[in-house]
Amino acid sequence: ADAATAGVRKLVRLAIEKNIRLSLMPYPKHVLHYEAERRCEGIEARWNELWKIAAVVEQEARGKAGPVEVWDFHGYRDANAERVHAGKAMRERWWQDNGHFNHEVGAAAFDSIFSAGRAYGHRVDTRNFDGLVEAVERERSDFLARNPWVEPELYELARLVGAGW
């Protein structure tokens, strides 16, 4: 096992042993960030990483309901898809740029984890994993078809990065 998986396993074991509620989640990102990653690195590594985390949690829980959950806030819905440079003041935005969210995104994630409302994100386990991947890929296709601004903003971002922005 790689060092990252070993670290997650150690953390999960400790949470189970001490009966501490632990919610694991990859950092939420803006759709422009997801699209840049997808085009540069592919999407397989991201899904493989999430699968490994869900599998470790289930292995360590040994079939019992435990205090450890895996959540994913990847997606192409409103919370991750606000146009970053749409002329809004920072205090009115969910995103500072394509890699840094404001407190509204964090609050939406916490609301999904700690309340009954699940408007944002998905709880992940190995049983629902394939369905989650299919749903996100379908969501992506639909989103990109409805939002032609993504392509030019992605190219502008690449131009800025290439120019040493």
Report the location of each language-model feature:
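Conserved, well-ordered alpha-helix/loop/beta-strand core segments that scaffold catalytic motifs
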Residues: 1-66
